[in-house]
Structures are given as C-alpha cells and as structure tokens.
Amino acid sequence: MITAEECRTYKEFVDLYQSYLYPLLGARLSRMYSPKNKVIIDMGTGPGYLSIQLAKRTNAHVHAVDINPAMHEIAQEEAKKSGVSSLISFDLEDVHHLSYADQYADFIVSYSCLHHWEDVVKGLKECYRVLAPGGKIVILDTFNPQGSHLEIMRKQIKEPEYFRFVREAFEESYSFEDIHQFVQDAGIPNYSLETFHFLPEDFIESLDELEDAPLWEQNDQSTDHEIESVTWMLTIEKEKEGAL
C-alpha cells in the first residue's frame, strides 16, 4: 500500500496527465449501465474521479471502494468539490473479502486497479458474487506494452516521480492470455475481452469537460492513443434469473 504522500503525488500525476480520461470513461461506462437497484461499485477508486463521473451521469448510488484510507481522504475532498457527496459512499474494502451481500450491485467497474490485486481469481469471484443477475462488471487495465510504447510515454511524462506510476503499472500488468485464464479459473461463463478504444460518442458527450482538462488543448491527443493501445477491457455479464 502506498503512503499518504505517495497518494497525493499520484493525484498530482493524474490531474496533470490523465484528468481528461475520466469524462471519457464516465461517458462510455454510463452508457453500459442498466439500472435496477441503482447501485454501482467503483473498485479501486483512487482519487475518486471515476466515481464522481458515474454519480453525475447515472444518478445511481456509487460505492467508491479503496483499501487505502489516504486515497479515500482525497476522493472525499474531490466529491465534495464536485457536489456529489450525497451520491457516493466511501468504503474501505479489500476486493478479496468484500463485505457486500450477494447480488448487491447492478454495475461494478474498475479502472487501472486489477494489476494491484494479490489474487486476481479470488477478486473476480468476489465481484461476481456481489453482482446482481442481469448486471455487468467492466474492468479496464493495462497489458505489458511491446516495442516503443513505454519510451514514448517516458518522453511525454518527464517527471520521474510521476512516470514511476506508469512504469509500475506496466511491470505489474497481465497479458490477454493471463486474463482469459483468470476469468476461466474463477468459473465465470459469460465474458468478453478486447483491446479498449474510445468511441466518437465518448468525446461528443465529454466536450465541455475536455475543454477544461490540462494538456487537452495543447497536445495532439497522442497520449490517449498510447493509453488505448495498451489497455484492455473485460466485460462480464451475469445472466438474469430464469434466463435460458
């Protein structure tokens, strides 16, 4: 677990280099959400930006889950600034031992967190247990890039204290084959795994927020293409009760 100081450094990194990603992710994920109980879990919320986006866009109750109290402190500050605190619960939870009841959540999301899980199979089983019939789990994370991807990002992210987070995410990442095996070992039947790409609708729905995002105006958006090319999306669906 990273220290409180490292959590603040991570937030600074995200604010400078990745803040524009969250409106785009929020747009995509909110379109994938089918409300039933109106409960969303953001597994590994970090600074809370994805939870905030989902709360704004879906009006569901979002559980912002993190195992690190220092990250929760940051996320709570950001939610208060955004005016959505009443829609978000900040839960100190371990993905391997979730306290939620069976079939509790309609939608479980996780961005750039799975590579931190100590036991991916156990974490997937817990998420699937908590997922309601008819619900979805959507997990996005990196796989280890080939060739020049890391060096390109090193040139774009010049601060060593920030680049560290990118390098470690790549070093701890899993291959497509690994993810397929984890899901199968977890006994999860209905899933898809693909390389992630933003869609035109994601940009259209996020234009107002993107205009205010650092680096968006002055760069050529090459960073988001690099992020896309090394990001996978796992989508798990639990069949509705009584479905054939």
Swiss-Prot record:
The organism's place on the tree of life at top rank: Bacteria
Family matches, as Gene3D superfamilies: Vaccinia Virus protein VP39
Family stated for the protein in its record: Belongs to the methyltransferase superfamily.
Native source species: Bacillus subtilis (strain 168)
Record's protein name: Uncharacterized protein YxbB
GO molecular function: methyltransferase activity; S-adenosylmethionine-dependent methyltransferase activity
PANTHER family reported in the protein's UniProt record: METHYLTRANSFERASE, METHYLTRANSFERASE TYPE 11 DOMAIN-CONTAINING PROTEIN
InterPro entries in the cross-refs: Methyltransf_11, SAM-dependent_MTases_sf
Highest classification ranks of the organism: Bacteria, Bacillati, Bacillota, Bacilli, Bacillales
Disulphide bond pairs: none
